[in-house]
């Protein structure tokens, strides 16, 4: 039969590229699990009362090429003015070697958070370098491996200051009046839920206020003034006040380290180390503190440890501080950092080295001096005598200056009374400075750049002598070796080879949704139309962004069944926080601000209680029954007991136990009956899209992990995006922004992120995914994710019991394998199996969550049958190895499992094990071998001997 033109056009071609198993393989797997079709399987598993009758109307699929052309046209509506707005965001020059070999390399951007250090040594080393940069520039003892953005870091600094303060009765936090406005915005949001009073005043008046536990200063103020806070910090320390200082990485190359002046905490944005502005993000924040406060720090910390052979190895240290263990007692709810962006900044510093960075910083400062000298020579007044890269220029006819700037396609900062702000950066040239003279003075100014340069080179006093850095930075060999592109390329490749990412194997992590991040989805993020926009540029310059965000928001509204979407949260955890704040403010608007009880099932991810605590709520745990479902009787009892103060429930659907709970609508009804709201955690949205939706189920608010369900890559531990969907009654209470009015949002609430649309430059990834999949493709993706999980469960259930199942013995999109009986019989643990999987070429599933002693497996729809079978065969082979231990063939203390993983050097080392080298490193005929570079990490040694800066190069060799 002749094919139709529509069939030949094959507009849904990408669906087959994204979904792993083809139609024939899907049928094979359906036969294996005993289902006739995908629809039949879905019908068996998903409760009938929540199944959508028709897929959400998000349009038909488009080809990769059509979608790219459509988005390119939208991006073309953005206007690429030269922005001198500053306020914590500047243009950058991302070295092409880093762009090509890292940002555009799936070996870097598809990796997961390095919870399995044996398969993560490359990015752990890059993150350790990031920590070393932070330590050198801030002058402090301990640094984390990045936070979400500078404003979030400021809020974390305030929370940490309260935790470590010895002034236990003090409840006030002082903020200098010249911090960036978006920083103050996020600090105020956090302070409100914690019950802190925020005082905003001139820094000189910090000592005038009583009952202050912490102070936030900004080394280079938002309008450019360099402050020497040494004396003030000393006086504050004498009063036992915790001092936090916001700083700028590039400025710190030349300026005195705040830690040397006595600061307790120093933080800021690493954006200008090679990360494009991207209309607000994603960017990595840096965070450092004194050693005595290390256990109260937020964020991940990379530490140097040893492996089982005594070799130097890296790992994430002090994880007991984090939300997945400490829950509501955690230092922060944030489980996403900004690894990919931190590593760009890290490699930027490695590539340029201390000499190159000083050259860049001095060039920026020289051009700023030249601009200042010329303006002053022509009679204009500068607000500040001391500056690094930013001038605050008083102008008589501000409107005329701004009009000339617009005509020249230049953005100046315009929100300063009777003045304009101008921030220069590493992209600024002498020609740009000449153009700025024309804008500020008119064309007939007669200034000469070369003459001005000679003058300022001989007599620059714009950085006060007391603030000039007098110590060396970045002296470690890693920052002084890789300065040719050849060396840099090879260094980055050597790091990449140490890690296991999706370009090598399936990453079957439960609750993480490690699906394909397609090349077509990634291409737009580096387009200059998206990458180069300042987040505070005039809205008419960002019409392309607004159209793309509006379309994506509309699609997400239809997919979730909600009425509105807020794009601001930078991670799922931040989305939880924003959603809970919306609930809190909704209750307050009804004069029910006393409602502060948050019900959370015992099975919940640790982020849930941590977020509830951060939103000022009290956690009450709801029991689960023997099948892992929410115990309805206990829920009713708790809801009724706390009816007067019930704020909400946080539930995950499908549940964290990997099943579709039959009573989810009843759960929603019970909570609503007693005046509460329903927060449905979107972590498992990949099993809902096109089949059901949170709004249809009965929830009021959810966050969506765009880095899970909607294809933003995990980046080795960030970036992420956690926009929230809300019903209409909560829409007025989503985050707003103090600098930018968010179109279509009536909210007057404070911000949770520095930028109005969070990490806007990665939203095109999700736009592309939805556009290329269309309604039918999205539904099919969810169905195949369910099929793949049930196929694995069906084939492994005789070797490893599946802990929880729903109707007909089915699971949702993931399954929990119970290792506890095996451990009781043989002594082999889930940890041993996880590490042995590395020898088979796999990343481990999720260990001991949500149930200790288990492995949770989520294959996603992107994995084909061949890869699923390879994983299943590996798990069955490992089960056979466990039986060998059980039978006494191999002793418990010396077998391939407890010694896993095995490294290449063991092949030529002395061999005294009761199993062969072949069994160790080529088990079950593994052909495409991944080689870990370290053996199993010694976690106890790492935490007892905390060391979080770069080690000698020889230790890596």
Swiss-Prot record:
| Function noted in UniProt | The glycine cleavage system catalyzes the degradation of glycine. The P protein binds the alpha-amino group of glycine through its pyridoxal phosphate cofactor; CO(2) is released and the remaining methylamine moiety is then transferred to the lipoamide cofactor of the H protein.
> Which co-factors does it depend on?
pyridoxal 5'-phosphate
Give one Pfam hit by family name. GDC-P
Q: How does it assemble?
A: The glycine cleavage system is composed of four proteins: P, T, L and H.
Reactions catalysed: N(6)-[(R)-lipoyl]-L-lysyl-[glycine-cleavage complex H protein] + glycine + H(+) = N(6)-[(R)-S(8)-aminomethyldihydrolipoyl]-L-lysyl-[glycine-cleavage complex H protein] + CO2
List its EC numbers.
1.4.4.2
- Can you tell which superkingdom this protein's organism belongs to? Bacteria
Name the top EC class: oxidoreductase
In this UniProt entry, the residues modified to N6-(pyridoxal phosphate)lysine are 708
Q: Supply the alphabetized keyword list.
A: Oxidoreductase, Pyridoxal phosphate
Give the family from UniProt. Answer: Belongs to the GcvP family.
GO cellular component terms, semicolon-separated: cytosol; glycine cleavage complex
Cited InterPro entries: GcvP (IPR003437), GDC-P_C (IPR049316), GDC-P_N (IPR049315), GDC_P (IPR020581), PyrdxlP-dep_Trfase (IPR015424), PyrdxlP-dep_Trfase_major (IPR015421), PyrdxlP-dep_Trfase_small (IPR015422)
Return the protein name: Glycine dehydrogenase (decarboxylating)
Q: Which GO terms describe its molecular function?
A: glycine binding; glycine dehydrogenase (decarboxylating) activity; pyridoxal phosphate binding
Gene Ontology biological process terms, A to Z? glycine decarboxylation via glycine cleavage system
Q: Read off the Gene3D superfamilies from this record.
A: Aspartate Aminotransferase, domain 1 (3.90.1150.10), Type I PLP-dependent aspartate aminotransferase-like (Major domain) (3.40.640.10)
């Amino acid at each position: 039969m002749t094919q139709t033109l529509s069939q030949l056009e094959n507009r849904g071609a990408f669906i087959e590229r994204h979904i792993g198993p083809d139609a024939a393989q899907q049928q094979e797997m359906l036969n294996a699990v005993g289902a006739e079709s995908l629809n039949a399987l879905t019908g068996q598993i998903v409760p009938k009362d929540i199944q959508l009758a028709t897929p959400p109307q998000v349009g038909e699929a488009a080809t990769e090429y059509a979608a790219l052309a459509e988005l390119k046209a939208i991006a073309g509506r953005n206007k690429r003015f030269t922005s001198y707005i500053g306020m914590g965001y500047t243009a950058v020059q991302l070295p092409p070697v880093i762009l090509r070999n890292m940002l555009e390399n799936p070996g870097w951007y598809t990796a997961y958070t390095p919870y399995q250090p044996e398969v993560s040594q490359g990015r752990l080393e890059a993150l350790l370098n990031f920590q070393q940069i932070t330590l050198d520039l801030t002058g402090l003892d301990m640094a984390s491996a990045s936070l979400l953005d500078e404003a979030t870091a400021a809020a974390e600094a305030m929370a940490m200051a309260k935790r470590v303060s010895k002034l236990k009765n003090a409840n006030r936090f002082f903020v200098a009046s010249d911090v960036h406005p978006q920083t103050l915005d996020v600090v105020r949001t956090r302070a409100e839920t914690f019950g802190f009073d925020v005082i905003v005043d001139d820094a000189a008046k910090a000592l005038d206020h009583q009952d202050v536990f912490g102070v936030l200063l900004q080394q280079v103020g938002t309008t450019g003034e360099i402050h020497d806070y040494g004396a003030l910090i000393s006086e504050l320390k004498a009063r036992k006040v915790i001092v936090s200082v916001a700083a700028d990485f590039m400025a710190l190359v030349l300026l005195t380290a705040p830690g040397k002046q006595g600061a307790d905490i120093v933080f800021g944005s690493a954006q200008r180390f090679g990360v494009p502005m991207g209309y607000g993000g994603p960017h990595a924040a840096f965070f450092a503190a004194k050693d005595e406060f290390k256990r109260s720090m937020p964020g991940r910390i990379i530490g140097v440890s040893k492996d089982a052979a005594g070799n130097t190895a890296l790992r994430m240290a002090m994880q007991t501080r984090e939300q997945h263990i400490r829950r509501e007692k955690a230092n922060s709810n944030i489980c996403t950092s900004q690894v990919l962006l931190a590593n760009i900044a890290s490699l930027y510093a490695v590539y340029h080295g201390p000499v190159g960075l000083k050259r860049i910083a001095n060039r920026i400062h020289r051009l700023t001096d030249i601009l200042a000298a010329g303006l002053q020579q022509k009679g204009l007044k500068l607000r500040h005598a001391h500056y690094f890269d930013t001038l605050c220029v008083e102008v008589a006819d501000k409107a005329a200056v701004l009009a000339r700037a617009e005509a020249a396609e230049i953005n100046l900062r315009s929100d300063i009374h009777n003045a304009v702000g101008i921030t220069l950066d590493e992209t600024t040239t002498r020609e740009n400075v000449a153009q700025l003279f024309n804008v500020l003075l008119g064309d007939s100014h007669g200034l000469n750049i070369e003459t001005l340069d000679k003058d300022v080179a001989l007599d620059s006093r714009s950085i006060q002598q007391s603030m000039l850095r007098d110590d060396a930075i970045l002296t470690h060999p890693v920052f002084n070796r890789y300065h040719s592109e050849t060396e840099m390329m090879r260094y980055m490749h050597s790091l990449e080879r140490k890690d296991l990412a999706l370009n090598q194997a399936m990453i079957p992590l439960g609750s993480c949704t490690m699906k394909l991040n397609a090349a077509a989805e990634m291409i737009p993020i580096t387009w200059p139309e998206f990458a180069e926009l300042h987040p505070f540029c005039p809205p008419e310059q960002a019409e392309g962004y607004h159209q793309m965000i509006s379309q994506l928001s509309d699609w997400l509204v239809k997919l979730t069944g909600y009425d509105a979407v807020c794009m601001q949260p930078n991670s799922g955890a931040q989305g939880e926080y924003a959603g809970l704040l919306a609930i809190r403010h909704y209750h307050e608007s009804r004069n029910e601000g006393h409602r502060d009880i948050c019900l959370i099932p015992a099975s919940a991810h640790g982020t849930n209680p941590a977020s509830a605590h951060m939103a000022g709520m009290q956690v009450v745990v709801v029991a689960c029954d023997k099948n892992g479902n929410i115990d309805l009787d206990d829920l009713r009892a708790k809801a009724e007991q706390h009816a007067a103060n019930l704020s909400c429930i946080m539930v995950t659907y499908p549940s964290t136990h990997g099943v579709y709970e039959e009573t989810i609508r009843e759960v929603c009804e019970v909570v609503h009956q007693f005046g509460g709201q329903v927060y449905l955690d979107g972590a498992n949205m990949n099993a809902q899209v096109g089949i059901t939706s949170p709004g249809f189920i009965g929830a009021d608010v959810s966050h969506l992990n765009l880095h899970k369900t909607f294809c933003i890559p995990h980046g080795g531990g960030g970036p992420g995006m956690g926009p929230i969907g809300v019903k209409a009654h909560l829409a007025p209470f989503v985050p707003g922004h103090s600098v930018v009015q968010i179109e279509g949002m009536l909210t007057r609430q404070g911000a949770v992120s520095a930028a109005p649309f969070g990490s806007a430059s990665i939203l095109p990834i999700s736009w592309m995914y939805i556009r290329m999949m269309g309604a039918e493709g999205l539904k099919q993706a969810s169905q195949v994710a369910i099929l793949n999980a049930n196929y694995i469960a069906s084939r492994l259930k005789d070797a490893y019991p599946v802990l929880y199942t729903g109707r007909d013995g089915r699971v949702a999109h993931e399954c929990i394998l119970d290792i506890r009986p095996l451990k009781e019989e043989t002594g082999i643990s889930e940890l041993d199996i996880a590490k042995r999987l590395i020898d088979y070429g796999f990343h481990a599933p999720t260990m001991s969550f949500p149930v200790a002693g288990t492995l949770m497996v989520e294959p996603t729809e992107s994995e084909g049958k061949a890869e699923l079978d390879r994983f299943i065969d590996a798990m069955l082979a490992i089960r056979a190895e466990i039986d060998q231990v059980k039978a006494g063939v191999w002793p418990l203390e010396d077998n391939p499992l407890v010694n896993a993983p095995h490294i290449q050097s063991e092949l030529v080392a002395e061999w005294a094990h009761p199993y062969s080298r072949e069994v160790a490193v080529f088990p079950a005929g593994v052909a495409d071998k991944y080689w870990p570079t370290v053996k199993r990490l010694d976690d106890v040694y790492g935490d007892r001997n905390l060391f979080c800066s770069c080690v000698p190069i020889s230790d890596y060799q």
